[in-house]
From Swiss-Prot:
Belongs to the Psb28 family. It is found in: Plastid, Chloroplast thylakoid membrane. Keywords: Chloroplast, Membrane, Photosynthesis, Photosystem II, Plastid, Thylakoid. This is Photosystem II reaction center Psb28 protein. InterPro entries: Psb28_c1_sf (IPR038676), PSII_Psb28_class-1 (IPR005610). Part of the photosystem II complex. It comes from Phaeodactylum tricornutum (strain CCAP 1055/1).
Length: 115
């Protein structure tokens, strides 16, 4: 199974996100902020598929989900989706990183540390 992201269950998001990670100094918690610029979920034809119910990160291990999903509007039109996924334990961080590794491999993404 390929790693994928969905906002409506059963409908894969094709636009690749910009993902920013932060982690507490002791490594116990972390936050991933996803930004999708002009995602296909905002397309008028896609809107007929249903409502955005959250962000679902799906891979062979299962589903990670967050309900923290917001649209960004420019001149009254939706232009981007921002979603925040919070990891509350080192195990949750490790699980998220395994998902991102698979998602990156599937979509040709690379990880780079901030300088």
């Amino acid at each position: 199974m390929e790693a994928k992201i969905q906002f409506i269950k059963g409908l894969d998001e094709k636009v690749l996100p910009d993902v920013r990670l932060t982690r507490s100094k002791d490594g116990s918690t972390g936050t991933a902020t996803f930004r999708f610029k002009n995602p296909n979920i905002l397309d008028k034809t896609t809107a007929k598929e249903g409502e955005i119910t959250g962000m679902y990160l799906i891979d062979e291990e299962g589903i990670l989900e967050t309900r923290d999903v917001n649209a960004r509007f420019v001149n009254g039109k939706p232009e981007a989706i921002e979603s925040i996924y919070i990891m509350k334990s080192p195990e949750a961080w490790d699980r998220f990183m395994r998902f991102m590794e698979r998602y990156g491999e599937t979509n040709g993404l690379v990880f780079s540390k901030a300088s």
